[in-house]
Amino acid sequence: MSLPPVIAIDGPTASGKGTVASLVAEKLGFHYLDSGALYRLVALASEKQGIDVKNGQELGLLVPKLLISFKNSQIFLNGENVTDAIRVESIGLRASALAVHPEIRSALVGLQRSFRQSPGLVADGRDTASVIFPDAILKVFLTATAAARAGRRYKQLIAKGISAKLEDLLQDLQERDARDSSRGVAPLLVADGAKVLETSDLSIDQAVKTVLDWY
């Protein structure tokens, strides 16, 4: 029996891949996996437990102990709604730092693959197109300039009532891009066979339509 189809969407931080992926899933009636949220959940849980972000072994052992669930666009960790808590910049930076550990990536592989259910799945995040779902029917690398991404993130934070400085966000994104692209484990790169979608000058609706047309 053939496995349900997967659309895998990757790209740099704040490229809009999560928004596009969730809307594509909604249009197709597919399940949705935000793999980046899983790393943010590990970041939040490890911070609460005081685990050093450099301790890959201890972080890897933490993953199986976490009770994670996605319900109606809300994300729960051990029964607590942490949808907003995992989106703050400090947790994003911590998630990027701990994602370099192979122990964590290995621990999350099985969890991510469990989301592959009928009628299909749209998965966004690092590794989805190369390691987690190498047989994805469509692989998309969604990108935009650092300036465009910083501007989008700034608007998102301000809309949520969170104070932010555009220049600080731009610097953080540039540093994360450099770290994500150069790390030895799962670096940021275009997967074999992936289509590149540059969204600096595209609206969300235009990006979603492009992905649907490719599918």
Curated annotation (Swiss-Prot):
It catalyses: CMP + ATP = CDP + ADP; dCMP + ATP = dCDP + ADP. One of its GO terms (biological process) is pyrimidine nucleotide metabolic process. It is an enzyme of class 2 (transferase). Its main location: cytoplasm. Keywords: ATP-binding, Cytoplasm, Kinase, Nucleotide-binding, Transferase. It is found in: Cytoplasm. GO terms for cellular component: cytoplasm. This is Cytidylate kinase. InterPro entries: Cytidylate_kin (IPR003136), Cytidylate_kinase_dom (IPR011994), P-loop_NTPase (IPR027417). Its EC number is 2.7.4.25. Belongs to the cytidylate kinase family. Type 1 subfamily. ATP binds at residues 11-19. The keyword Nucleotide-binding applies.
